[in-house]
Amino acid sequence: KVPRPTVLSFDLEVYSSDPNTFPKSERLGDKIFQISCILGKQNDSEQNYEKTLLTLGEPSSQVTGEDVEIRMFNTEDDLVVGFTDYIQETNPNIIVGYNIFGFDIPYLIARATAPCMCFREFSKLGFLKDTEANLKTIKWSSSAYGKQEFEFLDAEGRLFVDLLPLVKRDYKMDTYTLKAISTYFIGETKDPLSAKGIFKCYDVGTKRKKDGTFGKKAKKAMGIVGKYCVQDSVIVLKLFEKLQTWIGLTEMAKVCNVPIFTLYTQGQQIKVFSQVYKRCMYDG
C-alpha cells in the first residue's frame, strides 16, 4: 500500500530592479516578495487544499481569494525565514515545484546568504527544527535528463521534487512552460501576467501613503500578483496528482532499491548497481 504523504507546493515571485532583465540574486535592488504555499494530502481535491500566501505589502484578500490565508512581512529576510517557519509548522513530507532546482531553491539560497544574511535560520528546513540543512551541489548527466547541475538543501525528512525534469524525461512537448504543460494535462492555466506586469505591480504595491498604510491601489496590485502566485502552486500540485508522480517514484525506488531522491539526482547507473549489490548480498 502506498502511503498518502503531505505535499507542499510552492512558488516564488521575484522583483527585478531593471524591468528589462531577469531578476538576479546578487543584485541588491532585486528581491523575493511573495511565496505561495499550497498544502494537501495525496489524492486531495482542490477544495481541501490549504492555501497560504507569504508576502511583502498588503494584498487585497478580495483579489487573491477569500480562501487564501495571507501572512504579511516587512522585509525580504523576514519573508524568507517565514517560509522556513511555515514548513516547520505544517511539516510536509514532500516539497514540490516547477523548475525549483533550476531557479526557486538556488535563488532562495543566494538571497538568504546575501544580502538577507539569514541563511542559518532559513536552512532549518528539516524535521529536526533546530538543525541546519547541509548545502549540497548536484552534478550529473544522462540521456533521459540531460545535464543537471544545481544547489539544494539536504533537509532531513523532506523530499524535494521538481516536476520540470520529470516531465521532460517522460513526455515530448514543443514547449515545457508551466502554462503549456498545465493546459495540456489538466486543462487549466493561470492568469496572463507578464514579468514586466509583475514588476510594475510590485512597484505600485509597495508604495505606502503618508500615514504609512497601503492604499486600495497598492493592495489591489499586490493582490493581482498574489492570485497569480497561488495559481502557480495550485496547478503544480494538481499536476503532481495527475501525473501520478508519487506512485511512479515510490514504485521505481522499490524496483531499483534506491532512495527516491536518487532517481533524479544520480543518473541511471546507480539503479543497476543497486540491484546487482542486492543480488550479491542474497547470493552471499
Q: Whereabouts are the PLM-identified features?
A:
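Common nucleic-acid-contacting/processivity interface regions adjacent to the catalytic cores
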Residues: F199-G284
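Extended, Lys/Arg-enriched charged tracts that mediate electrostatic binding to polyanionic substrates
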Residues: K1-D18, F127-G146, E151-L153, Y277-K278, ...
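Active-site-proximal helix-loop-helix substrate-binding element of RNase H-like nuclease domains
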Residues: Q47-L54, S61-I70, N74, N91, ...
